[in-house]
Amino acid sequence: MWLLLIRKYLCIVILLLCIGNKNTDTLITDSLSIYDNHPTLEISEAKYLQWVDSLLGVKDVKLIDYRNGIYQYDDTRFYWNRTFDYFLVYPSSFTHGEESDLGNGNHFVNEDSTICLNVYATYFDVFKDDYSLREWFDMMIDSEVEQGNRIIKKDITDHSYTIEGNTKSGRCFYSKAICKKAYGREIIVTVKLEYMNFIKKQAEKIISMNINHFLYNPLE
C-alpha cells in the first residue's frame, strides 16, 4: 500500500513539473518576449515553408517565430508543437511566450493580461502499466485541487476530460485534456484558459472557437 502511495505521489510531482514550476499568475507577467528572430534553419526559410505548406495542405503559411512554433495563415495565428505534433489556434492579438524547456508547450496572453492561455503535453504510455487512462485523468484533476484550485464542473469521457472552476488567486479557469497518438506514442495534451470574471464572454468565445477545436491541423 505504501508503495502505491509513493508511486502516486511521484506521478503527481511529474504532472506538476510538466505543467511548469511557475504558476499562471507569474506566467502572465514573465517570459513574454517575442522571439521573432528565427534561429538558423538547416534549410532556407523558403524551402522550410514549402514543406510546411505541403504538410498542412495549404499555400503561403507565414513563419512568425520558428523557435517557439508560431505560424500564421491569412488571419489565423497558430502554435504548432512539432515535438508532440499538436496545434492550437489562438487569438492573433495575444502575445506568445517562450516554448517551455521541455519543449512540450507554450502560453499566450492578451494585452492587459486578463486572459492567459496555456497548453502542454505529457507522455501517458510510460504509465500505462500502472494506471488506466481514467485513473490518470483522475490524478491530473486531483493535482488541480492540490494546487488550491476549486473545481465546480467536471466532464470525463473515454479519451478526454473537461473541468471548470476557480484558481486559488480568484480567476476563473477552463481546462480540457485529450489523449492522442503522436509519432506512435500515446500522449495527453492539456489546454487551460484562465481569465478574470468580468471578461467571461470573451473567454467563452475562445473556448468555443479555439479550445474545443484544438490538437489537429487547424487549416483543414
Per-range role (PLM):
Residues 1-10:
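Bacterial N-terminal signal peptides that target proteins for export
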Residues 2, 19-115, 123, 145-146, ...:
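N-terminal targeting sequences that direct proteins away from the cytosol to non-cytosolic compartments
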Residues 11-21:
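Hydrophobic h-region of N-terminal signal peptides that target proteins for export
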Residues 119-149:
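Short, solvent-exposed recognition patches
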Residues 151-154:
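Surface-exposed patches in mature extracellular/periplasmic domains of secreted proteins
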Residues 159-175:
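Short, Gly/Ser/Thr-enriched beta-strand-loop segments that form substrate-interacting elements
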Residues 176-181:
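A short, hydrophobic, proline-anchored segment that marks a local hinge/packing element in signaling
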